[in-house]
Every structure is written in structure tokens, then in C-alpha cells.
């Protein structure tokens, strides 16, 4: 079947699933496709394809749409995509992407980890999917800690979460190893306080080598940014160094804070979603804010387009173009092959 034989409904469905960066190239495919881009109805349909979750690992991006019906792993640099079939439509799930290297073949493979609280709300349920197979498996994991969902990052293939102990509620950090499909040992933060003692806490990656954490206790505007030693596959113990202390009440109180830190320039770039009240309309809305703060505590706000996904917290990460080839489904061997 040729493109000209496809129905308009099917064409519109295809275009709604194409990454935005590729849409411009498709306009020159034929007159019909170009006319679809001009059609306001189709353009509005494209805008309705919202992204609810994004996660970054090794130059690959994992996208989940607003109703958990579309899951895509994308390498923007290589222009490759891999569509993965979600196992259920449930917006309470969280998804992360990680990698591991096979000891014998030295080949790097990728897995998607999905988790959510069970109906009783006291236990996390985990499922994992090999990217090459799209086959989901249930993991038997028992933990004595809870995940701080708003703060998880990927480094060297592992996923790191801020966590809090179920008994004393102290904030710590744990990582998930995709080779063993298990959580590692507890990694203490620079200082220990119960989760409720923190006004703001956020996790970040520094130059794909280190982890960084922003900490602010309740009742104070003082914020500290700490950075770990370099992390590799053999790192067993983390040591923390404080690189920046800020004392400014103009930022850091909003949920979903995401940040970068420049160790040399002693400067931090922050993204956060803030609740704003418009006097003229009496409407309360969420707006994304982007700003830099340095040792002088001066806040410089930057221009930033508002997101089409009001429910999604700002998520910022350092992206380095990757030559990683996305694994595609392996063909089942036929008899006689």
C-alpha cells in the first residue's frame, strides 16, 4: 500500500505520533501531507498529544503520554525511536530508563522500570521491561524506604532516588542497578533530618560524573548545594562537598524544583513551577520559572516559554548527543533458519 492509498484518518493518526522535530521534514513528502499541516483541525489534534513524563538516560529520552497509552524511547541525535507497549492505562505509574552492560558480551542494553503504590498504599509494586523484547516482568522487591518521586536522575546507567526511611523518615538516597534488578545500599545525604524538616530538596547530575543535591530546611531561606565525588561502576562510598550556599527568599519554595550547578562559576540554574494568582481574572494558575543565582544571591529571571502540559513539573537535564543504537524487537527465529 502506498501513502496515497492511506485514509485521511489514518494519516492524521500517524502524524500525531511523529516526534515534533521530524514533522517539518514530512511536509515535503506530498501535497496531501502538506495540506494536513495547514489544516487547523489537524494542528489542534497534534497539540493535544501531551507528554506527562520524560526521563533521560545515556542520551536517550523516554516519553510517556498523558494517559499512559504511548511510550517511546527516542535518540534525538540518531533520529531513532522505539515504541513500547504499556501494560495498562494507569496514570499513577512512574517510569524510568536505565542501562547495564553484559559481562560476557560487553554489550550495553536498556530496561524500563515501572512502579506504583499498591491499592493499600503501603507498598511499591515494580515491573521491568527489556527494551528489545517489550515483555514486562513483575519484580519481587521488598524495601524499608519510600521513594521521593519528584527527585530521581540517571547516572552511569543507574537510577538514583532521594528516599526516606519508613521508620524514622530520614531523607537518604538509593540507586537501582539494572544488571541485578535490585536497589543498592543506603547512601546518606550530607546531613540527616526527617523528610518533614525540609522545605526544598532536589537531585541533579553534574557533567555526567557526579550527583548534586539542593537542601533547604523549613523556617529558613538558606539553601545549600552539595556535590559528590566522581561516580563510576566501582564507586562504593560517596563523599559530599558543599559548593554553594545561597540565602535568598525569592526562589526554592515551589514544588518540582529542578536545577543545574556550575562548580567553577559557583552558579545555579533553576527551573520550578510556581502557583500564581492573577488579580484581574481571579484565576490561580501554575507558571514555569527559570532563573540563575550566584554567590552574590542575585536572582536573574530568564525568558521561558510556558509548557503545554500544566500538570507536568519542569524537568531539566544535561544532554550530550549519543551514538547509542536503540534496541529493536528481536525477530523470532523460524524453523529452518
Curated annotation (Swiss-Prot):
Gene3D superfamilies: 1.20.1280.50
PROSITE patterns named in the record: FBOX
Domain F-box: 1-46
Record protein name field: Putative F-box protein At4g09870
Taxonomic source organism: Arabidopsis thaliana
Upper lineage: Eukaryota, Viridiplantae, Streptophyta, Embryophyta, Tracheophyta
Amino acid at each position: 500500500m502506498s501513502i496515497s492509498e492511506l485514509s485521511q484518518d489514518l494519516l492524521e493518526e500517524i502524524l500525531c505520533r511523529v516526534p515534533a522535530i521530524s514533522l517539518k521534514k514530512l511536509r515535503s513528502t506530498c501535497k496531501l501531507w502538506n495540506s494536513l499541516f495547514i489544516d487547523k483541525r489537524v494542528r489542534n489534534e497534534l497539540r493535544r498529544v501531551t507528554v506527562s513524563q520524560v526521563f533521560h538516560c545515556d542520551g536517550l529520552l523516554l516519553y510517556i503520554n498523558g494517559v499512559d497509552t504511548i511510550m517511546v524511547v527516542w535518540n534525538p541525535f540518531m533520529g531513532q525511536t522505539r515504541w513500547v507497549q504499556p501494560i495498562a492505562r494507569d496514570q499513577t505509574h512512574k517510569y524510568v530508563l536505565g542501562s547495564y552492560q553484559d559481562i560476557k558480551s560487553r554489550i550495553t542494553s536498556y530496561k524500563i522500570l515501572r512502579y506504583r503504590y499498591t491499592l493499600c498504599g503501603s507498598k511499591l509494586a515494580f515491573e521491568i521491561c527489556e527494551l528489545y523484547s517489550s515483555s514486562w516482568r513483575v519484580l519481587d522487591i521488598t524495601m524499608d524506604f519510600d521513594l521521593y518521586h519528584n527527585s530521581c536522575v540517571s547516572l552511569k546507567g543507574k537510577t538514583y532516588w532521594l528516599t526516606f526511611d519508613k521508620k524514622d523518615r530520614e531523607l537518604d538516597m538509593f540507586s537501582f542497578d539494572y544488571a541485578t534488578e535490585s536497589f543498592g545500599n543506603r547512601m546518606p545525604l550530607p546531613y540527616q533530618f526527617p523528610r518533614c524538616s525540609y522545605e526544598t530538596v532536589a537531585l541533579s547530575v553534574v557533567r555526567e560524573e557526579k550527583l548534586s543535591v539542593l537542601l533547604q530546611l523549613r523556617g529558613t531561606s538558606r539553601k545549600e548545594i552539595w556535590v559528590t565525588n566522581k561516580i563510576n561502576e566501582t564507586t562504593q562510598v560517596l563523599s559530599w562537598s558543599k559548593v554553594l550556599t545561597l540565602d535568598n527568599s525569592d526562589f526554592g519554595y515551589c514544588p518540582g524544583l529542578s536545577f543545574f550547578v556550575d562548580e567553577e562559576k559557583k552558579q545555579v540554574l533553576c527551573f520550578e513551577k510556581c502557583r500564581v494568582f492573577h488579580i484581574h481574572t481571579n484565576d490561580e494558575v501554575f507558571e514555569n520559572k527559570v532563573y540563575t543565582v550566584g554567590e552574590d544571591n542575585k536572582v536573574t529571571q530568564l525568558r521561558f516559554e510556558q509548557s503545554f502540559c500544566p500538570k507536568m513539573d519542569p524537568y531539566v537535564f544535561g544532554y550530550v548527543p549519543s551514538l547509542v543504537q536503540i534496541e529493536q524487537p528481536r525477530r523470532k527465529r523460524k524453523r529452518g533458519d
